[in-house]
């Protein structure tokens, strides 16, 4: 977990005249190179992630763990020496997962590993029992005739392809975000998707989904990759595949969480801002170490290292731990709306987020 190249670029931007990186003096360059070396040798980012995942753990937005995470982030920034630490409110509806179960009833009875998608409704008091209709991808589902899925469970089995730069995510994620709407339009009573991820382990991967106001809401869940393979193998045998699906999930009243913001004040142009950050929330099925504990660790450490320089950065460095990114970018939107309302958008010289894991940095995008 080494925020080396990103830290170097950010420190150069914070130190330099806007859009004039080539005008850096030797002192600025030496300071940036020193930051890089300290980041390579140190473990500050790792220590932040270890603290977050141990002392808070999963941080589903709107739950008590969310509130604990906010207090943790505020205290951590203060302990790391930020000049100013403060909270800004972020309000959003709360989605809660209670339980999820699925099994094949026929032709070859066996359990399935699933997880409800974020925002999904439940199946109600009685589990859904229905025949499966499988689709290779979202486009195939869209092409199905109207009414062809009446009383059926749609299963979308497209795979996410692994690429270093993550470009396989975009083509795959439509099944998750749009699958429930498209399946309901064809008459389906539920939709299952292959987990949007490249793991071959038997763990289902959650993520947010969407409904449309003019289409009935149906339950939506993700199958683990091996279980999606299992459904494909059963369907290929030409016999009707029938499932039982039992999901309890709900969206409840609005909740107010907070963006947690820490600043290292600039020495010459404190009103001009370089922002970096990650999102503080996570899903509830793991510790949130990668998504996005890693980004929190990288950006907290970067800000703290800049703050430890003998000479403060020319511009203010603002580190933001955003609330509820997972379910709709609520924290980022609230931050942008607050800056627009205050007339402060033009003060931002750079905005960057770390939400791509903890491998070696190879580009600043």
What are these regions (language model features)?
Residues 178, 199, 256-259, 282-365:
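Acidic/histidine-rich catalytic neighborhood of metal-dependent amide-processing enzymes
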């Amino acid at each position: 977990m080494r925020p080396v190249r990103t830290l170097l670029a950010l420190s150069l931007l914070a130190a330099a005249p806007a859009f004039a990186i080539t005008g850096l003096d030797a002192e600025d360059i030496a300071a940036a190179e020193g930051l890089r070396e300290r980041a390579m040798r140190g473990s500050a980012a790792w220590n932040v992630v270890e603290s977050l995942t141990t002392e808070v753990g999963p941080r589903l937005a709107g739950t008590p763990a969310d509130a604990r995470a906010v207090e943790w982030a505020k205290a951590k920034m203060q302990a790391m020496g930020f000049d100013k630490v403060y909270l800004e409110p972020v309000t959003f509806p709360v989605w809660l997962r209670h339980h999820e179960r699925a099994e094949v009833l026929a032709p070859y009875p066996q359990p399935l590993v699933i997880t409800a998608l974020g925002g999904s409704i439940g199946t109600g008091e009685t589990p859904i029992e229905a025949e499966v209709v499988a689709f290779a991808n979202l486009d195939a589902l869209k092409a199905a005739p109207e009414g062809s899925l009446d009383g059926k469970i749609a299963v979308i089995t497209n795979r996410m392809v692994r690429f270093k730069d993550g470009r396989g995510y975009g083509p795959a994620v439509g099944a998750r975000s749009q699958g429930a709407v498209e399946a309901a339009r064809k008459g389906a009573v539920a939709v299952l998707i292959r987990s949007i991820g490249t793991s071959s382990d038997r763990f289902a991967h959650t993520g947010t989904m969407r409904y449309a106001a003019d289409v009935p809401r149906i339950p939506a869940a993700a199958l683990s990759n091996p279980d999606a393979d299992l459904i494909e193998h059963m369907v290929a045998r030409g016999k009707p595949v029938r499932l039982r699906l039992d999901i309890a999930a709900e969206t409840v009243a609005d909740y107010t969480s907070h963006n947690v913001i820490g600043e290292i004040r600039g020495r010459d142009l404190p009103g001009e801002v370089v922002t970096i950050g990650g999102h503080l929330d996570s899903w509830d099925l793991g510790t949130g170490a990668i998504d996005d504990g890693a980004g929190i660790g990288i950006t907290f450490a970067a800000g703290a290292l800049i703050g430890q320089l003998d000479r403060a950065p020319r511009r203010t460095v603002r580190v933001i731990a955003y609330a509820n990114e997972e379910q709709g970018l609520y924290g980022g939107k609230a931050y942008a709306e607050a800056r627009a309302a205050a007339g402060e958008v033009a003060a931002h010289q750079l905005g960057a987020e770390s939400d791509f894991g903890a491998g070696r940095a190879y580009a600043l995008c």
